[in-house]
C-alpha cells in the first residue's frame, strides 16, 4: 500500500519505513491475486503495529513471532473492527507477517464518509491507542511524536467486508438498555451533534478494543495502539472516547421513567430543570384593610373576614376572647354582633338591606296600611271574634248556639282540635268567629287567634272557674292588646257560682262591671240559649267602639288560619282576608310557597268568586302547603310570585346546610332518645302535638322528632322509620293502602290517635319503656359453711347449716367473709341427705354446690337472694 501523504513521512522521519512499506505492498499485491477478498484480521494488524513501533524505537527489544508464508496462519476473528480500513475498497489485500524481528505492518486506515463532500484531503492526527495483548509476550511502546499527519481517505465504503457481530443492536444501544426503557429523542434545541457515518459498523465505547476490560487483560498479553481520527468540528467532550465512565449505580424511579424519557446511555444535560414554585410572601402591613364596608345579613364568618381583608382565624380568635365561640362556617345574623366585630378591627360596618327589600313585598303591617289609606276609601268591616278558654268549658257549644249548627258533635272526644273560622249573620250584623282549641297542646293556635282577632270572648265555666288555659288565653289577649269580653257559661247548672268567677277575674286584674270595673261579663248557657242575645249586642257595641274599617279596593292581604293536604285537591289553606279583596285567579305569595287561586269555598263548602275583608275562605292551587300563621299578599302575576319565593328559598338554603352542633351535654349524660315521626291532618295539629311531646322533660330520656308533615302515612315515612328505628305517630290521619304490607315486613311501630292527650300519654309510656329497670336485691336466707368436701367430678361441696330464711335452688348467692362480699353467682345444686330439694328452711343442714366458685372456706356465710326489677319513672 502506498502512502500518498508526504508530510506525514517527512514529519515522522520514516524513510526506512517507506521502503519497508513498499516491499510489503508488492508482496500484498501478489497474495491478493491468489486469496479471496477478506478483511484483515485484527490480531494480524495489531502485530504489524507492534513491529512498526520496534523500528521507530530500536532501544526497546521486540520479539516477533516467526510465521512462514507457506503455511497460512489460523485466522482469528477480531472482537471489534479496527480503527482504519485499507485504501483500496475493491480488492483489499491481506498483509503477510514479516519473519524478521524488525518487520512492520502498515497502519490500517478506516474509510470514513465525511459529512462535507470536498475533494481536499483531510488531515488525521495519529494518537496513541490502547494496547492489545498477545498470548506470547507483552510489549509496551512509548507514544510516537505528537505531530499532525495527513492521510488521504476515500469516501467510498469497502465492499464485501465481513461484518463483525456485536452485542449492540442497530440503535446503538445494548439490549439490556432497550428492555429497561424506551428512548425518546430530546428536543430539537438540545439535540447533540450528529455523529459521522462510517463505512463499517460503528465501534461502541462500552465494548471498544481501545479501552479493554479486565477480562481482556487477563486473556491477552499484547496491547495495540491504533490511531483514530479526531473531529475538531465537534464540541469538546462530544466524542465517546473523551467521555468519562458513567456511574452505573441504580437510580430512583421517577415520572420520566414511566414515559421512557430517561435512558442510562443518554446525556442528562439536555433535560430542563423543573421550575420550582416559589412561595409568595405577603407583608401584612402592605394589605390595605377597609375602614368602612357594607354587608348583608345573615353572613358567615368566612364571608365577613373576606370583606374585611382578614383571616377567618383572626375573627374567631377575637370573638373567642370576648366569650363568643364560633367556627368558620357559622352564621352571624345579629347586627350588633357584626358591628362590634368591625369596631374591634377599626372598621365601620353598615348593614346592606337591598336584597331583603326586593324580597319583602310588604313594607308595613295591615293596620299601618289601613291607617295610611284615604278615609274616603275605607268601609266598616265585620268584627273578628275569637272564643278562647279552658278545655270542656263549652266554647264550641256556645258557638253552635250562635250559628245554630252542631259542630261539637263532629269533634273527636267532644273537644276542639282544629281552629275553625266561620262567618255568621246575627240580628246585629255579620260576625266572623274563630273557634280556638282549649287543650294545653294548642297554645300556638290560641296565640295566632289572639293576633288575628279584634275581640276575645273568654269563656269560663261557672261551676269550675278559671283554669290554666284560661289564664294563658288572657295572657295572649293582653299581649295583642285586644278587648276581652267574659262569658260565664253553664249558668243552667245547679252548682253555678258567678261570684267565684268574679273574684278570680279580679285577681288577674280583670275587674268585672258588677264590681265596678270595666270588664264586661255575661252569664250564658249554650244549652238553653240564655244570654246569647246580650252577648251579640255587646259584641256589636264593642265593634262600634273600635271603628273597624278596611279598604276593599286594595290588594288582598291576610293570614293563614289552617292548612292541610287534600287527596284530590292537593295543598289547601283556610285563610282570613284582613284588608282588600281576594279574587279568583290572583297570585299569592306566602313565606316559602306561592300559588294561584283556582277555587274558593266558604264554611258551607259553597263556591265563592271573591273574599272581602274579615271573610274566611278555603283556597286551592298552591305550590306547597303553607304554615299556619303565615301572612300572604297578592302580587302582579304567578311568575313574579315564583321568582320571589325562589329567591327566599335560595337564601334559606344558603345557611340551611350548616351542621348542627352536637349536644355535648346529652352525650356526657348518656341520654336515651325516642325518635318520632309525626303525621297529622292539618299543620296546626302537628304544631300542637310536637310542642306537647317536646315538653316532656326528663334527665334520663328525651324525645326527638325526625320528621313532621301533613297527610297520610306513606311508604317513605315507613322506610324512614325502619332506617332510623323511629316510631310513627298518626294524629287524625290514616295509612295508605299500599303501605300497610310494608309495615308488617319492616316491623315498624305505628300508633294512630284521634285525641291529643292520648297521643301524649302513649309517648310518655314509650319513653319510660326505653329506660333500664332498676334492679333490687331481696335477701331470702343465709347459711353458714360447716364443712367442705372435695369431689373429683363436681368440685367442692359445702356442708351448710341454714341460719336464717330459706335457701332456694337456682337463685343468686353471695359469699361473705368478715362482712365483705367475695363472690356473687348462682346456686347450682342443693341437696338434703343425698336428695335434690328445691329449698331448705331454717335450722336444717344441706349440701350446696356453687356454680364456678371453689374457694369458700369453713365459717363463710352464703346469702341467698333474688333480683327484682322496678321500672324507672321519667
From Swiss-Prot:
Residues 1-289 are annotated as: Disordered. Residues 435-438 are annotated as: G3. Residues 31-48, 144-158, 186-198, 228-260 have a biased composition (Basic and acidic residues). It is found in: Cytoplasm. Keywords: Cytoplasm, GTP-binding, Initiation factor, Nucleotide-binding, Protein biosynthesis. Residues 380-549 form the tr-type G domain. Residues 105-118 have a biased composition (Low complexity). Coiled coil: none annotated. InterPro entries: EF-G-like_DII, EFTu-like_2, IF2_II, IF2_N, P-loop_NTPase, Small_GTP-bd, T_Tr_GTP-bd_dom, TF_IF2_bacterial-like. Residues 525-527 are annotated as: G5. The keyword Magnesium does not apply. Belongs to the TRAFAC class translation factor GTPase superfamily. Classic translation factor GTPase family. IF-2 subfamily. This is Translation initiation factor IF-2. It comes from Chlamydia abortus (strain DSM 27085 / S26/3) (Chlamydophila abortus). The lineage of its organism: Bacteria, Pseudomonadati, Chlamydiota, Chlamydiia, Chlamydiales. The gene is infB.
